[in-house]
Amino acid sequence: MKIAFDGKRFFNNNSGLGNYSRDLVRILATCFPENEYVLFNQSRSEKGKEILELSNVSFQETSTGNFSRQFKMGKDAQEIDADIFHGLSGELPLKWTDKPIKKIVTIHDLIFLRFPQYYSFFDRKIHFWKFRKAAKQADLIFAISEQTKRDIIQFLKVPESKIHVIYQGCHHVFKEDQSEEFLNSIKEKYNLPERFILNVGTIEERKNLLNIVKAINGEEIPLVVIGKKTSYFKRVQKYLKKNQLENQVHFLENVSMGELAAIYKLADIFVYPSFFEGFGIPVIEALFSKIPVITSNISCLPEAGGKDSVYIDPNNFEDIKAKILFLWNNESERKRRAEKGFDFVQKFNDENIANDLMQVYRNVL
């Protein structure tokens, strides 16, 4: 089987859609080496270079021309006799020849429709047009959670039979053991507290960092935050200054993937009170890192967290505070939930996800 992919996110995105693209190709190429996997893009980058070193993974430059991703990439995939074209980020090429090829698209979320206030009018219109067009063209749609599947049915009016839920995994570095020496070196490099709670993700309104900060106000609980800052950060910063919490909250930037994995392992608790997610990869990363999770009781987050994570109302910082204190002051409960969470998260291991993907690929042909 020859599978072609839209490689834009694989080569261009550092996190999010980039990680999804690289992990998907990596696990397929590793678990099913008999197939051929071809990544199309106008150019390649250093991202994912170790995956491209695999003998069954290759890069193919898209034909030149304006809007080549939209108008040339699909035809290029047909030209090399690909059996399947998989759009990894909610889009498919617009132009195809009559040559047979099956089309699959992954839709991660429809947050721009569910929470339109976070997006400009122009972005909402463009995203909606692209996603609706891809959903109509596709022979099958991968949704990364049951929540996303429900949204696709509701907003894009796609029949349920056309949608398959295939969960995401996470980078293998979060599943690897790390030496005490390395962990201590990271602790020293970033001057981390002896004990702390952790939050990972873009610092934006939807991720709800401000309610974590409000929850620890008045408590001697250090918070470490890792994520890209947006304009929302100013609101958080203003609250920190007003309440003299600057020394209690530590913001880290330019953290490598290996360092991030170490910081997860050093944390006591992972706190993720997001208002909405397509799936919630940081929850999976935390569970693989064997730390207990506190997350929202809405959206897809219970799918990612399992029954032994602790759930909160993201709108209620007093609820967040109570759940943080519950785990912070109870070592045996932290350990129990971390162990149960680690057992649960094995459903998202590479082999299970690769098998689910390949079963759908085979069925569509």
Show where each model-derived region lies.
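Carbohydrate transferase catalytic cores enriched for Leloir-type hexosyltransferases
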Residues: M1-L365
